[in-house]
Each structure stands twice: as structure tokens, then as C-alpha cells.
From Swiss-Prot:
Organism listed in the record: Treponema denticola (strain ATCC 35405 / DSM 14222 / CIP 103919 / JCM 8153 / KCTC 15104)
Gene Ontology molecular function: any one: magnesium ion binding
One Pfam family linked to the record: RNase_H
Localization (cell): Cytoplasm
Highest taxon of the lineage: Bacteria
One of the protein's GO biological processes: DNA replication, removal of RNA primer
NCBIfam families registered for this protein in UniProt: PRK00203.1 (NF001236)
Keyword Ribosomal protein: no
Residues given in the record as Mg(2+) 1 binding sites: D8, E49, D85
Stored Gene3D superfamilies: Ribonuclease H-like superfamily/Ribonuclease H
Name of the featured protein: Ribonuclease H
Alphabetical keyword list: Cytoplasm, Endonuclease, Hydrolase, Magnesium, Metal-binding, Nuclease
Classification of source organism: Bacteria, Pseudomonadati, Spirochaetota, Spirochaetia, Spirochaetales
Cofactor note: Binds 1 Mg(2+) ion per subunit. May bind a second metal ion at a regulatory site, or after substrate binding.
Catalytic reaction(s) noted: Endonucleolytic cleavage to 5'-phosphomonoester
Name of the encoding gene: rnhA
Length: 160
């Protein structure tokens, strides 16, 4: 089975109340496997974007046995793709992170990397799961991206 994960984050006032969400689907059958959302009282949009991906990959890492399709068969995946509308997440994990690690978690301008705690957690999860990272244009009619956006906004509103 091939898994697609759609993620999104939302924040009001940045920093302010925020929400994250993910939807996991079987790419082959298009069947939804699971969805989850949550939030924080004081955060940023970038932290929520990162948290969405981290929570989804943690769900995978918890064990495929905890994820089953509707037939009850445990999840046995061949590949995972993460779809995000956040250039920050997609570029960060696919490109920038290599220099950040090489430079002791400093940016090219020698400043500490923002959200280092989450980037380190995502780096560890990504190294073991090895997902493909795909950027999708937000608010462009992709049904799963739009659904994820609604879930993240809903979680954000609950934090207000």
C-alpha cells in the first residue's frame, strides 16, 4: 500500500492561537485511513505546519498495527508521500536542514534556526520513515488539502 498524507497548519494573529491537522489516505484505493487535528493557545503558523507533519509521521511510527484499513487489515506500506502547502516545511526538510545541521543549527546568517526543536524531531522521524515531500498549492481546489485546511482552522478556533 502507498500512503498519502496531507497536512496543514493555521494560526490567528501569528503568534496566537493555532491549529494543525493531517489526513492519511491509501493512495491506491483512495480510502481514508485516519485524520487528526489539534492546537495550541499560543503558537505560530510555521510551528503548526511542522506539528501537523510530526503528528502524522508519529502516527506511522507508532506502528502500522495501530492503523488499519476498513477491512481491519493492518497497514503495510510501501511508500509514504507528505503533501504540504507550506514552502517552509517542504524546503526546510528537503533542502535547508542539511546546512542547518552542518552549521550547528544556525542559518546562513549565523542566527539560530527558528523552531529548532520541531525541526530536529521532524528530521529524526523523516530519517526513519523516508517520506517523499510534495508541495501543493494551498487554496487551489485540492480536496484533501482543503479538508485539511478546514480541520486546522477548526482546531485553531477551539483554542480561542
Amino acid at each position: 500500500m502507498n500512503i498519502e498524507i496531507y497536512t496543514d497548519g493555521a494560526c490567528s494573529k501569528n503568534p496566537g492561537p493555532g491549529g494543525w491537522a493531517y489526513i492519511m489516505v491509501n493512495k491506491d484505493s483512495k480510502e481514508e485511513i485516519c485524520r487528526e487535528n489539534g492546537g495550541e493557545k499560543s503558537t505560530t503558523n510555521n510551528r503548526m505546519e511542522l506539528m501537523a507533519v510530526i503528528r502524522a509521521l508519529k502516527k506511522i511510527k507508532e506502528g502500522a498495527a495501530s492503523l488499519a484499513d476498513k477491512s481491519g487489515k493492518a497497514l503495510d506500506y510501501k511508500s509514504i508521500s507528505v503533501h504540504t502547502d507550506s514552502q517552509y516545511v517542504q524546503q526546510g526538510i528537503s533542502s535547508w536542514i542539511f546546512n542547518w545541521k552542518k552549521n550547528n543549527w544556525k542559518t546562513a546568517s549565523k542566527q539560530p534556526v527558528k523552531n529548532q526543536d520541531l525541526w530536529q524531531e521532524l528530521d529524526s522521524l523523516s530519517a526513519s520513515i523516508k517520506p517523499e515531500w510534495i508541495w501543493v498549492k494551498g487554496h487551489a481546489g485540492n480536496p484533501l488539502n482543503e479538508a485539511c485546511d478546514r480541520l486546522a482552522v477548526e482546531a485553531c478556533q477551539k483554542m480561542m
